[in-house]
Each structure stands twice: as structure tokens, then as C-alpha cells.
């Protein structure tokens, strides 16, 4: 008995390891893309937002300049386009049930799958939240968006200056 493991078992082990490595690679690429999209959107919203402006106001003021910047960013980075089936504003009910928040608003994109939240807490501090999604896709098998996991981040706080 020269071989402890036969050729077919060794091939099965190698294929299994290859599949696991590819899944980890796909997961890390999806997470990186969603993380970069979330941070890019957050930077744009923070640069256009001001104290007391809800998410819809930020996205529509100046002829939609913030929305145009965000859509350009997402288009350039290859973020997943989901025209007509957005998961938008999923976190809205959770945020509205938070007792430390007085006011919560949400704006969702119609072209890309992300949401922008604006919140005012009980101490009259204003901040924005961004929710993007990490996707796992199998385009060779015609399966898009097999799994999607939300990634959420808050902006820095805008304080009321009197």
C-alpha cells in the first residue's frame, strides 16, 4: 500500500479547498466594494448636508448635485445596479423605535441599492446614516443577488450652533 490517499480523494480535497478559497475571495471583494461605496456616499452626504436638513432635502437641493455625485461614484466603482427593486429604508423601523431619536427620515435610490437616513436625537444633534449592501452573485448560473447583507454607518454629528 504505497498511497495512503487515492488520486480521486486527493483531487476532491483540492477542489474543495479551491471552492472555499474562491468563496472567501468573492466575499472579500463584495465587502470591499460595499464598504467603499458606503464610505464614499457618507463623504458626499456629509459635504452637502447641514444641520437640520433631512435626507431628501440633501439629495434634491442644488438640482440634485449630491445624488449625481453619488451615482457617478457608484457607476465608476461598479456597484450593483438594482433598477426597480431596491431594498431601501429597511432600517427605518428599527431607527424609529430607538428612544434616543426624535426624528428619522429616509431617502432611497431608485437606481442603486442604498439608503440615506437623517436623524435627530433627543439632544437636538443631527446625523446621517448610510446603508449599502454586500452581494454574492453567480452570474454564470444566471443567479444575481443570491445573498445580500446590509452594511450601515453613521456620519459625524452636526451640532446646533446658537
Predicted regions and their residues:
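Glycine-centered recognition micro-motifs in short, flexible terminal segments and loops
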Residues: 1-17
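Residue-level detector of functional hotspots within protein domains
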Residues: 10, 20, 116
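Generic detector of short alpha-helix boundary/capping microenvironments
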Residues: 15, 22, 118-120
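Aliphatic-rich helix starts adjacent to a transmembrane/signal segment
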Residues: 18-47
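Short, conserved structural patches
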Residues: 39, 43, 47-162
Amino acid at each position: 500500500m504505497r498511497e495512503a490517499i487515492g488520486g480521486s480523494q486527493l483531487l476532491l480535497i483540492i477542489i474543495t479547498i479551491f471552492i472555499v478559497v474562491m468563496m472567501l475571495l468573492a466575499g472579500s471583494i463584495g465587502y470591499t466594494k460595499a464598504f467603499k461605496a458606503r464610505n464614499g456616499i457618507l463623504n458626499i452626504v456629509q459635504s452637502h448636508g447641514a444641520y437640520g436638513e433631512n435626507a431628501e432635502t440633501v439629495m434634491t437641493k442644488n438640482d440634485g448635485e449630491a445624488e449625481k455625485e453619488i451615482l457617478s461614484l457608484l457607476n465608476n466603482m461598479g456597484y450593483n445596479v438594482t433598477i426597480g427593486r431596491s431594498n431601501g429604508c429597511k432600517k427605518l423601523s428599527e431607527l424609529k423605535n430607538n428612544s434616543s431619536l426624535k426624528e428619522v427620515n429616509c431617502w432611497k435610490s431608485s437606481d442603486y441599492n442604498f439608503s440615506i437616513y437623517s436623524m435627530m436625537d433627543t439632544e437636538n444633534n443631527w446625523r446621517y446614516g448610510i446603508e449599502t449592501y454586500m452581494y454574492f452573485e453567480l452570474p454564470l448560473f444566471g443567479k444575481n443577488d443570491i445573498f445580500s447583507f446590509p452594511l450601515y454607518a453613521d456620519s459625524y454629528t452636526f451640532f446646533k450652533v446658537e
